[in-house]
């Protein structure tokens, strides 16, 4: 059933696009901006517990942020749609924590951040707020919409 519903929604949007493309686009965008929040398992929390965790406010939501390492070079990891900071686990483990401070956030409506809506401008605002706290970046790495957000 979990796989059937997205397929039915896709079929509906494809059929609607034939007769009412603007309406199909509007509904598609509405759905895209409301991600399904995935459940966090014990191994996700164990990884998050290995970080220095902190929260900040952005766009009316509480954003969960993480920091690994205390190095002088700041790196930001920006996840994609319907994901959370755990997706960066292997990357975080690969960084030399004496040389890098590795930051990640859970986007609005994702992971441990609050909210039900996520758009690139909202996500970008959260990234900008974080950068106001941590300062200049050495690098940013993004996946999918996270990559778009990092350069928005």
Predicted feature residues:
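Proline/glycine-enriched tight loop/beta-turn segments at coil->beta junctions
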Residues: 68-75
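Active-site glycine-rich loops that stabilize anionic/oxyanionic intermediates
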Residues: 72, 80-83
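Conserved alpha/beta-hydrolase
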Residues: 85, 92-114
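Gly/Ala-rich beta-loop-alpha elbow adjacent to hydrolase catalytic centers
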Residues: 141-142, 146-150
């Amino acid at each position: 059933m979990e796989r059937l519903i997205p397929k039915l929604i896709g079929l509906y949007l494809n059929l609607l696009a034939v007769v009412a493309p603007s309406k199909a686009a509007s509904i598609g965008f509405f759905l895209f901006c409301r991600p399904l929040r995935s459940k966090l398992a014990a191994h996700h929390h164990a990884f998050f517990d290995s970080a220095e965790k902190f929260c900040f406010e952005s766009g009316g939501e509480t954003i969960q942020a993480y920091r690994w390492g205390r190095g002088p070079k700041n790196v930001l990891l920006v996840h994609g749609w319907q994901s959370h900071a755990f997706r960066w686990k292997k990357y975080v483990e690969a960084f030399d924590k004496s040389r890098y401070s590795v930051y990640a956030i859970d986007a609005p409506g994702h992971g441990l951040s609050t909210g039900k809506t996520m758009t690139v401008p909202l996500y970008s605002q959260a990234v900008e707020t974080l950068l106001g706290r941590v300062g200049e970046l050495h690098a940013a790495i993004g996946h999918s919409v996270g990559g778009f957000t990092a350069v928005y």
